[in-house]
Swiss-Prot record:
The keyword Flavoprotein does not apply. This is Urease accessory protein UreF. HAMAP family: UreF (MF_01385). GO terms for molecular function: nickel cation binding.
Length: 250
């Protein structure tokens, strides 16, 4: 029997060690993102519907099919896509520890909010997220970046900065962010009662491939790619401010 080549054995061991390290890194990324984007994370995501409450009141969202169509448009043409691009760029600022880039991105993200309620939705969640994450998951550079953003912080910017500072993979960040957005919207729809739990689960499953495709696109998209075309949602967010009966803040 031929003796094993020591060089080949060492190479195999090194490759196995690299694979193990990569798996450990992916598991760590998943654990952080699952914690940060969980409904239990103290950002108050449950209080916002991103215009969905008005859409249900107006009859735009009334069943499984209309909910799926509404959310597909919000993901593809609305704030969700913009947020994914902003989160990806904030990831770069967090990775580099670049406070100027963080400030510029935050100013841009807040300026993109089309109404008072949607501005509150992103700024309150972002501020809460950054404060909670700095306290519970400190990372080199993250606290310094947070001190440069003492006021309102856009939610995608806060999540992106934290993910970059913790060296989470960018694609994982963007995919997790979009998935959490979708899940929160469906959760709001369940409370508004146009769909039940089984229908909501089917909507999430049907839109998951779109989430993956948008994450791949947003990961490397330039800021020039920002833009939205969800006028019905934007106008509805204005009307929601004076809606007679409501349970959400947006």
């Amino acid at each position: 029997m031929d003796e094993a080549d020591p060089g080949e054995a060492e190479a195999a061991q090194a490759e196995a060690a690299q694979d193990g390290a990569a798996q450990d890194g992916a598991a760590r990324d998943a654990l952080l993102l699952l914690s940060w984007l969980s409904p239990g994370y103290p950002v108050g995501a449950y209080a916002y519907s991103h215009g969905l409450e008005w859409a249900a009141e107006a009859g735009d969202v009334r069943d499984e099919a209309s909910l799926g169509a509404w959310l597909a448009d919000v993901l593809s043409h609305g704030a969700a896509r913009n947020d994914a691009i902003l989160a990806a760029h904030a990831h770069g600022a967090g990775l580099a520890g670049d406070p100027r880039a963080a400030e510029a991105l935050n100013d841009l993200a807040l300026a993109l909010a089309p109404s008072r309620e949607l501005h509150l939705e992103t700024s309150q969640q972002g501020r809460s997220f950054l404060d909670a994450t700095v306290a519970a998951w400190p990372a080199p550079g993250l606290e310094a970046l947070a001190t440069r953003l003492p006021g309102p912080v856009a939610y995608p910017v806060a999540v992106g900065l934290a993910a970059g500072a913790h060296r989470i993979a960018r694609r994982s960040l963007v995919t997790g962010y979009l998935s959490a957005f979708l899940q929160n919207q469906v959760s709001a729809a369940l409370r508004l009662a146009p769909v039940g739990q089984s229908a909501g689960t089917r909507v999430v499953a049907a839109l998951s491939p779109l989430v993956a495709a948008l994450a791949a696109e947003a990961e490397g998209a330039p800021l020039d790619a920002l833009g939205a075309a969800t006028l019905r949602l934007d106008l509805g967010s204005f009307r929601h401010e004076t809606q007679y009966s409501r349970i959400f803040r947006s």
